Amino acid sequence: MTGFQFNTVSDLRVGAGTAQQLGVLCQQLGIAKPLIVTDPGLVQVGLLDPVRDSVAGGCDEVSVFSDVTADPSESVVEAALHALMTASADGVIGLGGGSSMDVAKVIAVLATGQQSLPDLYGVDQVTSERLPLVLIPTTAGTGSEVTPVAVITTGATTKAGISSTRLLPDVAVLDPQLTLGLPSHVSAMTGIDAMVHAIEAFTSKIKKNPISDTLAKRALHLLAGHQRRVLSHPNDMAAREAMLLGATLAGQAFANAPVAAVHALAYPLGGHYHMPHGLSNALMLPAVLRFNAPVCEALYLDLATLLPQPVGPGVEGFVVWFEQLIADAGLPQSLSDAKVPEQIGRAHV
């Protein structure tokens, strides 16, 4: 066996009600004045209030930055950093989907004043220490709570990544109560995103290893086995917890055995057409699976055994299973369905 390295979060708290322990958790981390980073949608649906109340039970003062947008820009990061500095916060709590958690990661590093945002772009460019960091996902998709990566929008159609183990949080809190009632289209897109993470980690040509393989397979089993249930019964706590855990396991897998062609093709769609990341992944997945089939057949057939039956024969049966899931979820099944123009300029490719 070839040697490998595996990094992940050292402290995971999983289960219904775990977010009610945030005050105690902050005390354990030495956080007295945290900043909660989230988005307006979570404020509107009332998810912020119980989290803030829980945090307040163990802290002197709690501040909130709730202006995170999808595909957060550099200006959003700078605004969040300003809020942190104004509040003299000594810790950061990211609450939400990947966008909120990514912003939380970045400002926890920038808060020390040792580096500017452009200094961080790239791989292993973070040299600064960071503030204590807690991440709490409210969707079962990105796995950002356990990945050493943040993605920031740098222009009208461009993004830049930051990859460093210093972005891994001190603690990730997985509370399925915070995902109950998530809109079905969001559950569908984020769930498929997480499944793509698992598939691409398992079939990755780079850094694939026994730990990432084990996590990816367990992740796909959980995600594929509960995706339809959360769409038909959005308040099923057990199904929500399975999806949340599956997304986290997939995140741990692809954080160490990186994603590939599906994501490479999906990123430009998000950048140029502002398409949700989970949807762009769903659109690219079937074509990439078929393209890779000649060299990934054995791996795909292994993964096919983890899917709920019925699954048709061979690799084509594996691909069709995902096509049917995407269709049943009511998501667009082609670029034209998603309003992407047939003629795409060379600059967009």
Feature map (PLM): residue ranges:
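ATP/NTP phosphate-donor binding region
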Residues: M1-G91, E316, L335-S336
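Conserved small/polar residues in nucleotide/adenosyl-binding loops
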Residues: A347-V349
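Short glycine/serine/threonine-rich phosphate/pyrophosphate-binding segments
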Residues: A19-L22, Q44-L47, E74-S75, S99-V106, ...
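Glycine/threonine-rich beta-strand-loop-alpha-helix active-site module
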Residues: S75-P176
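Carboxylate- and glycine-rich phosphate/diphosphate-binding segment that chelates Mg2+/Mn2+
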Residues: V149-A257
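Gly/Pro-rich interdomain helix-loop hinge
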Residues: L269-Q343
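Glycine-rich phosphate/pyrophosphate-binding beta-alpha loops
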Residues: G141, T248-N281
